[in-house]
Every structure is written in structure tokens, then in C-alpha cells.
Amino acid sequence: MGILDTIRNPQDLNDLSEEQLEQLASEIREFLITNVSQTGGHLGPNLGVVELTLAVHRIFDSPRDSIVFDTGHQSYVHKLLTGRQDFSTLRQQGGLSGYPSRAESEHDIVESSHASSSLSWADGISRARQLTGEGDRHVVAVVGDGALTGGMAWEAINNIAADKKRRVVIVVNDNGRSYAPTVGGFADYLASLRPTIDSFRAAPAYEVALDWWKKKLQNGGPAGQFTYKSLHAMKKGVKDWWAPQGMFEDLGMKYIGPVDGHNLQALEHALATARNYHGPVIVHAMTEKGHGYAPARAHEADQFHAVGIIDPETGEPTGTAGAKSWTSVFADEIAAIADERKDVVGITGAMLIPVGLHKFAAKHPDRVIDVGIAEQHALTSAAGMAFGGLHPVVAVYATFLNRAFDQLLMDVALHKAGVTIVLDRAGVTGPDGASHHGMWDMSMVQIVPGLHLAAPRDASRLREELREAVAINDAPTVVRFSKGSVGAEIEALERLSDGVDVLARRPAGSTANDVLIVSVGAMSELALDVANRLGAQGISTTVVDPRWVLPVRRSIVALASHHRLVICIEDGVRAGGVGSRIRQEMRAAGVDTALNEVGLPVEFLDHGTRSEVLERVGLTAQQITHDVVAQVLGTKVPFARPLPGQQHPTTGSLPIL
């Protein structure tokens, strides 16, 4: 039995010797490599925080002391130390979440995996502790240097630093990266701290001497206090000359570090000093992403930030290569567009490769801007670029557009800026769970005046609609696509005058008009499956892909007026979604055809594969067909209306599907 097998809670760490702790760190790394290579997950970040997490749990008393992980993908070690060692179904339906989860443990606090929010959580928790008479309880926020490129982190620091008595410990996990190397002025500032003062200021002798002289002089009456203030000012001046690290202390926060993030003794000493300091403290820990695993360290792109199933010995992906991904199709096309148009620029929020701007950047490095984890800034900066005669393409995961809605509405749309926003990982994404599903975007952008929204169904339509988007220079455009592999090409029977594609009429050649199916983006394959099933039950269908779902095309409304029932199949939330908008346009035009929105419920959906999540919420061909048959037979609302010369059925039985 290894040492890891004996750990059930953080208190089990307290009696371990230095040698045992080193052995435990080795066992944890071996465990992570073995298990995450079988399930996929965030391997590199967790290999980099093994000693740091051990030290945090040995010095602080969780859950009495609150530990908050920014983004949370580096919480695997924390899970192991808090009694969760069944990683066999990590990120799978019914298994452990890839992020902190309150449902799993009292040691978990923040479940959202959106970056830069941990310090605001720490600020709020510490205020609550202070106001409820529990100000002696610590709040520890573990935040990466990448997350400190986000403005929200600095809003929190501004508030934390204002109160010198709250026990907030900010542990900066500085590995010089988020996905890729961290960029920007603050990244340069942190880099300036690394080689100069090293671990000198975190050494025990330094702190002991400092505390001894401080007490001696402050207890020496007015002369001693004057001498202390003079020497303290001199010390600060020398520090600022020796290394430009005065920013945190200028804000009124004690700074400890840099500390070797893989040296347990140094980490524990630094954290104990922070714990015993009755005020806000920054502990600056230098770590290495992928530490202890050669394949991760050698991986230039992101040091195994997130992996699929891999060979644990080599780090190479197992199995055969899959079909081309949506992201790779976008990457090729935007690079081609950039070759043709010098006014097109790319903007990424610290995710150059994941969002597919790397090929563009390789060809035109001066025209791709990495703004850090700063989506709000990205959108407003894009508006400024548009004003200056450029056409910015902001590529971001769909879930992260949530963070920049005000900027989209008030800076981009209000000023009719020609900005294209490309949303990767739209819809249900699967194993990363509630905070990563890109299911909110279509409802959000419905209320943005003048915005154009495209949802391509296949690779050809993605290329086509991306080019159409960057041709619009007087309004914002959004192009959204799913995670993973692109499906087969779906050719249209015809394209209507306003750009709507008719994909199928079932039965073929039918002139009957029972059900109009409006498919949004990648749901077209599902829509065609439903049409075939309905056709087998004698119900005629017309399947259309609007391509551009906003503004609603007139032909959609016209087709709706000639059908008994409209269903809109989308992989966003039903509330305020595409179907809802189509209904509004139908009613405004006096079309009273019943419409059924088939989409996602307004719920936070747990992790699982995409197909598992869709089945869980009823977005399957079988369930949709069952519901539509019931609506056509008049046994379920909304009832399909009778067309002229038809009578509404009053009875009927559902077939077995």
C-alpha cells in the first residue's frame, strides 16, 4: 500500500515526514499520469501543483479555512487529498467532475471554471467571515499568472488591499502560461521578479531577522518607532532597486516570494508566514506546468494543458485520428482570408491554438493579438480596431462570450462596428460540464440590435458563412460551431432567394405540408433523422437550414404559414432562443401556425458525453419524433393546426417508434 492510499482527508498529511511527503508527491504524479491518460483531462496543470497543493493543505485547515481554485482545472490533487481517489470515470457521466464540485465535497467552494474570478470570491468570503465574527478563518485563493491577465482579478485586488485586517492569502501559481505563454505587461512584471531575488526574501533567516528588528524598534519608544519607519523606508527603496517588485506592497499587501513551487519546505515556510500575518498576503510560487512528466514538458503547444486518451509512456494519442474538427476548418479558412485581406485581424483571449488562430498567426504574426484572459477588453478593443478601418475576428469559446455581453451590446453593436465573433465549442460540449457548455449564446445575442448570427451545419457552410460574416462592415456578426469533428457534408435541395437552404422534403416529392423543421447548425443531421422517422409514420416534412438564424429570414415565416406545425431544433437554451425569435416574427406577420421549440432546458447541465447530455434532455430523434406525432394527432400541445380543407383530429393513438 502506498502513502496515497492512506490519505482520506487533509489532516492525514500532518504526521508525514519530509521523506514521506516527497514519496507522496511522486505517487500523486504517477497516479495522475496513469489515470488521466485513460480518461483524458487537465494533466499538465495538475502535475505542476502537486507540492503547492500539499503545502496549502498542510498549512491551512480546510474546510474551516476556505480554499478557492481559480478556473479549477488544477484541482485534481486537491480532490485526491480530500478523499476522492476514484478517477476511473473522471469527467464521465456519474463520475467525478473535472472541476471542484460542492456535491462531491465540503472542501470545494467555487464550481465555475471561468478564469480570474477567484479573488472576488475570496474578497466576498473574507468579508462575510469578518462581519459574522469569524475573521480568524483564512481564505486562500490559488490563482495562475494567466488568470491575473483578467481585469476582474485586479478589481478584486483593489478591494482586498483596502482592508489591512482581512486574512486573505493569494497564492500566485506562476508557471508562465495559461494555455500558451502568458503575455502582456503584468506577465513581464512577474518575469522580472523570477531571476533577481529568487528565494531570498522567503528564507527563514530573512523573516526571523525582520520580525526581531521590527518588534525591537517598535517597542523602543518614539525614537525606536522613528528609526523603524526610517529603516523600513530605506528597506523598501533597496528592494525596489534590487528588484522591481514593489507593486503589491505599494498596494498595502505583504509580498512573499518568489518561492520554488516544487520545494515543499520553502512552500510551507512561505505559507506559514502568510498564515501568521494578519492581513492580505501575496505568496508568489514558481511552478512548472507538466512537472515530472517529460512528454508534457516537451509539448511546445500547451504542455499537456488538456489531453485526450494517451499512451502514458510516450504521451502520444491512442487510437486512429478522427475526422477534421470544426476548429481546424476555421483555422484553415481564416488563414486563407487573412492572405486575401490585409484589413482582417485576429484576436484571442490566451487561446491561440484552441480557437484556431495559430495558422493565421504563423503567416501574419503582427495581425493576431493575444489580449490575455480579457474577453471584455477584447470586444471593446475590436470595436476600436473597426473604427480604425480594420475588420477584427474575435475567436473565443462560446461559454466565454458571457463575460463580454455588455461590451458586445454597448461598444460593438451600439456603434455598428464591423466585428466578427467566432464562437467555438457552441452548444453541448460534454465532459467539462455546466460552466463549459456553450448553450447560452443564441439567447443572449437575440436581443442585440442589428446583430447577424450564423450557425453552419457542415464544413462547407462554415467556410461560406465565415466569408459572408467578414464582408459585413456595419454590424456585428457571430459565427458559432460545435466542439469536435465535423459531420458529413449535407447538400441542399435548393437555396431560396434569401439564403435559406431547403435540405429535404419527406416523403420525397410530397406536396403535403404537415411539419416544417427548422434545424440550427449542427442539428441538421438530427433534423433529417426526425424527418425520415416522421415520413415512415405518414407525416410529411420540410427541413430547412436558415444558415443565418438572425435576422429571421422571411422565407421561414412564409413556409411556416403553409405548414400545420413548425419545430425548431437548436442546441441552445429554449428560453429566448432561435425558435422563440421565429415565433415572434411569425406572430408579427399574422402567421398562427403552432411552433415547438426543441432545445435545451434552462438548467446547468452536468458533465457527460455530448450524446449522453442530449439524451438526458430529450434531444434525440426518437423523443422528438414521438412528441411531433402526438402534436399532429392532437394529443399534445402545441396542437398542429388544420390546413384549409382539413379537420383537426380529435382522437388518435401514438405509434410505437
From Swiss-Prot:
The record's SUPFAM superfamilies line, in alphabetical order, gives: Thiamin diphosphate-binding fold (THDP-binding), TK C-terminal domain-like
**Gene3D superfamilies hit by this protein:** 3.40.50.920, 3.40.50.970
Q: Which domain of life is it from?
A: Bacteria
| Example GO BP | thiamine biosynthetic process
Q: Name one GO cellular component term.
A: cytosol
Q: Give GO terms: molecular function aspect only.
A: 1-deoxy-D-xylulose-5-phosphate synthase activity; magnesium ion binding; thiamine pyrophosphate binding
The record's listing under Pfam families reads: DXP_synthase_N, Transket_pyr, Transketolase_C
Signal peptide boundaries: none
| InterPro entries with a match to the protein in the record | Dxylulose-5-P_synthase, THDP-binding, Transketo_C/PFOR_II, Transketolase-like_Pyr-bd, Transketolase_BS, Transketolase_C, Transketolase_CS
UniProt binding sites for Mg(2+): D145, N175
The pathway entry for this protein reads as: Metabolic intermediate biosynthesis; 1-deoxy-D-xylulose 5-phosphate biosynthesis; 1-deoxy-D-xylulose 5-phosphate from D-glyceraldehyde 3-phosphate and pyruvate: step 1/1
The catalysed reaction is:
D-glyceraldehyde 3-phosphate + pyruvate + H(+) = 1-deoxy-D-xylulose 5-phosphate + CO2
Question: What's the EC number here?
Answer: 2.2.1.7
Q: What class of enzyme is it?
A: transferase
Q: Which cofactors must be present for this protein to function?
A: Mg(2+); thiamine diphosphate
Name recorded for this polypeptide: 1-deoxy-D-xylulose-5-phosphate synthase
Which gene underlies this protein?
dxs
